[in-house]
Amino acid sequence: MGTHRIILGLAALCCFCLPHLIEAKPFEVIVDQSGHGNFTTIQKAIDSVPINNTHWFFINVKAGLYREKITIPQKKPFIVIVGAGKRSTRVEWDDHASLAQSPTFATLADNTVVKKITFANSYNFPSNGKINKNPRVPAVAAFIGGDKSAFYSVGFAGIQDTLWDSDGRHYFHRCTIQGAVDFILGSGQSIYQSCVIQVLGGQLGPGVTGYITAQGRTNANDANGFVFINCLVHGFGKAYLGRAWRPYSRVIFYNSNLTDVVDPLGWWEWNYQGYEKQLTYAEHGCFGSGSNTSRRAKWVKKLSASAVQHLADLSFINRGGWVEDLPIRV
């Protein structure tokens, strides 16, 4: 009887500690290029999801390089795509020039969740360590346009406009984002937590400075902005933390490791010279060889501790508690 109670107790403890291992998956299909799944392409699996879907629909993608473009339409919410790992499952395409038409992966739907997969736009991306000689143009790896969407251990690989964080509330956790120019852009209301931001400045040539973010907040009442919490910024060459794509651009780096890849000036007003007071760019509690702010642009705001805490908190994106309702846990 004593042994029986101990076993039951351990089972209960495991269930409490590891909720992510016992997620309910009411609808599930497998994508496998070898033909041993339900589909051989991710897009065909997405196509199988009913219009106006109301239940979490899991698409498990086996390891491999998938040469395809993927779109989740607006009327197909509640899709979960799970790969075998950022380095094992990779989706790659090479459209370019048109920002709107180039994304390798695009979701227009609310409640999109992705885990353990990499989306790459290969048009300008270096191959086997060699500089890519294609003319540099916008070439998007991923477009995120729906609300209440989350990305766990996802890779985004490109050079210019890699991750188009367009609109809606988004949560990125332990993701890797690679690029050189405006490679995290858009008007999303997003938290990037424990992510790796890798600057690939070698693609720009000697002495050319890149830009990590190009945030597009258009007026003072907009709730959107990019918040980076406990992130690592590293790589090669030099890059500004951000430049203003729109007149009320807002980006915060909080408790993050900024290496010397960060240009000492830090931020650029771009087309909004004379309107710098409208921009909200801040660094709080950051460390590392590129975190010294003594040479930052003089117009950069000094936010109060309470203002920083408001932005650098999950509540910034989590109205309604949608993050806790996701079928995948951190």
Curated annotation (Swiss-Prot):
Pathway: Glycan metabolism; pectin degradation; 2-dehydro-3-deoxy-D-gluconate from pectin: step 1/5
Location in or out of the cell: Secreted, Cell wall
Pfam families according to UniProt: Pectinesterase
Single GO MF annotation: pectinesterase activity
Top-rank lineage group of the source organism: Eukaryota
Site (Transition state stabilizer): 160
GO terms of biological process kind: cell wall modification; pectin catabolic process
Enzyme class: hydrolase
KW Nucleotide-binding (keyword) present: no
Chief location: secreted
The reaction(s) this protein catalyses: [(1->4)-alpha-D-galacturonosyl methyl ester](n) + n H2O = [(1->4)-alpha-D-galacturonosyl](n) + n methanol + n H(+)
Signal peptide region: 1-24
Active site per UniProt: 161 (proton donor), 182 (nucleophile)
PANTHER family assigned to the protein according to its UniProt record, in alphabetical order: ACYL-COA THIOESTER HYDROLASE YBHC-RELATED (PTHR31321), PECTINESTERASE 10-RELATED (PTHR31321:SF76)
Function summary: Acts in the modification of cell walls via demethylesterification of cell wall pectin.
Protein name per Swiss-Prot or TrEMBL: Probable pectinesterase 55
